[in-house]
């Protein structure tokens, strides 16, 4: 769907995978750029915008002070992108329902109605990966967003591999989509936000370090596997296990090298290693000597631990339950702006 209200019925779709022609950007590289304080007039901007292209690499960029996303993939087709070693922070300063990294899919299978997507994919298995024909990889980045999510996969974003990232503020949100493999990330002072997942989505969330309890919204399905994660609070693990998740996960002190300075490598004695977490390269941002001297870095906040997830009061009326919209996640899941 190009827009929420414009659809081609799935029975009329072309089921040939990928693009009709090769007339689109391919194998381009955006590397070692310092991008900041943009979007002074037009607010719907991004430091790097990728759309209807394939195998685009975005590497070692420092991107900050923006009204919206630092890196945005609008339309996942045709996949194969690599987003790595970027430092993206102070984002979504003048808009909402977005992230430091943001994406949407809206591919051939997609509809704003979850039940419609489930019915389409059940009737035509494989339609969900006709457009993002190669995985999109997000690895070894530092993302920061105080007004949204550090990583925000929206509107059917599918076929992603996300690993070895430090999310220092807004956590990681996955709306409906398919085949998102998330491993070995660090979610500082936040958590995993899964709203409105689909049946048999094939999603994995494994070997991650998580600070606060998960924040699910309207979740009837939990993907393929959510397990072997490390929580910094006992409450986080307990809440996950109440949902039937994280049977083999643990909680405790991750033994970060120096959380106050933003060094989130764990010591050789860290209990996080027992659940499969591994240290990774954190050489974020520009590498050019002159640009590195000029580039800013995100403000590192104190590490929060033993933080619970407060739930708002529900009111019953005529057999139905009501509550106020209290979080950015609930606002996004309900499509309220």
Question: What would you call each of these model-derived segments?
Answer:
Residues 1-4, 23, 39-46, 67-76, ...:
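Short glycine/acidic-rich loop motifs that flank beta-strands on beta-rich extracellular proteins
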Residues 16, 42-48, 87, 102, ...:
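Active-site-adjacent structural elements in folded domains
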Residues 159-261:
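Predominantly extracellular beta-rich ligand-binding scaffolds that present long acidic/polar faces
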Residues 245-293, 297-298:
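C-terminal accessory segments
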Residues 292-337:
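C-terminal recognition in membrane/secretory proteostasis and scaffolding
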